[in-house]
Regions:
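Metallocarboxypeptidase
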Residues: 1-189, 194, 199-204, 228-253, ...
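Generic structural detector for well-ordered beta-strands
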Residues: 185, 226, 269-273
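Short amphipathic, basic-aromatic surface patches that mediate peripheral association
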Residues: 200-215
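Extended low-complexity, serine/threonine- and proline-enriched intrinsically disordered segments
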Residues: 213-233
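Low-complexity, intrinsically disordered segments enriched in Ser/Thr together with acidic residues
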Residues: 258-277
Length: 277
């Protein structure tokens, strides 16, 4: 299924306080971008489904996006595609946007029927009619075509939904770490001895470790740099240089202390023996 027109994010079983502050800033920034591109509100699963189970607990544990964040450190979203309610002119509450899906009023129902008549030619609601059921006797059959309009976008709206949500997915991918070697200098100091200097930079938005949660989970490997074609005299052929911050760190520093330098680059140097130009 997919319905509701909302961007769901972690956490699922607990509140936002369980997320490290810097990760929370990133999640909120991604959510703002998603809201702008898709028109959907962004909310944690924990807030979107406040119903309690028979033991007085929220029944939202076990979400896949919570696992990908908690165990893999990946900022993940579950998109409930197709916002029928907003298309029909039904206003969503900011703090509980799924409520209009769970608790439909008579006024909302009339707006949905009007949308069906004016935008869909009335095809997605079947008028109730009697039917003789072999076991149940006389019954009535009719109502909404759930798969065609309630749980999925009608065909004439599908392309627009796909374009807006694909744009959000591409934008998320563009925010990942992006390691690059911006400058390399080679200084010849003897016939077969050279000093090599290289500036390693993270040009991406996220830090090289991805998220604070990835570091907590112990899966964020440090950046490694390796040289080939020469034998190091000073310096290692392959070395770990730790992690490099991304542009997201500048956002946090600006709010807290004003503009500052982001540690997103590392200058490395080797003395090597070899031949070449």
């Amino acid at each position: 299924h997919t319905m509701g027109g909302v961007l769901l994010r972690s956490p699922c079983a607990v509140g936002d306080s369980a997320i490290p502050p810097r990760d929370m800033e990133t999640y909120q920034k991604m959510g703002e971008i998603g809201e702008r591109l898709t028109g959907y509100p962004c909310t944690p699963v924990y807030d979107a489904f406040p119903e309690l189970d028979d033991r007085g607990r929220r029944n939202t544990s076990g979400g896949f996006i919570e696992w990908t964040y908690d165990h893999l450190g990946i900022f993940s979203f579950a998109t409930e595609l197709w916002d029928l309610q907003s298309r029909a002119g039904i206003e969503k509450p900011a703090k509980d946007p799924m409520r209009v899906v769970r608790e439909q009023t008579e006024e909302d129902g009339l707006k949905l029927l009007k949308f069906n008549d004016e935008q869909l030619g009335g095809r997605c609601f079947v008028r109730w009619s009697e039917f003789e059921h072999p076991q149940l006797g006389t019954v009535e059959i009719g109502g909404w075509k759930l798969k065609e309009v309630r749980q999925n976008a009608p065909s004439e709206f599908l392309l627009d939904e796909c374009e807006r949500n694909a744009a959000f997915s591409v934008r998320q991918a563009a925010m990942t770490p992006k390691l690059a070697i911006q400058d390399v200098e080679v200084e010849k100091i003897a016939d077969d001895a050279f000093v090599i200097r290289a500036l390693v930079v993270n040009e991406g938005y996220l830090p090289s470790y991805g998220s604070e949660m990835a570091q907590r989970a112990g899966i964020a490997k440090p950046v490694e740099v390796q040289i080939e074609g020469a034998e190091p005299i000073i310096g290692k052929k392959k070395q770990a240089i730790g992690h490099l911050q991304g542009r997201s760190a500048a956002r946090g520093m600006m709010f807290a202390f004003g503009a500052g330098k982001v540690e997103n680059e590392r200058l490395l140097e080797w003395l090597v023996r070899g031949t070449g130009e």
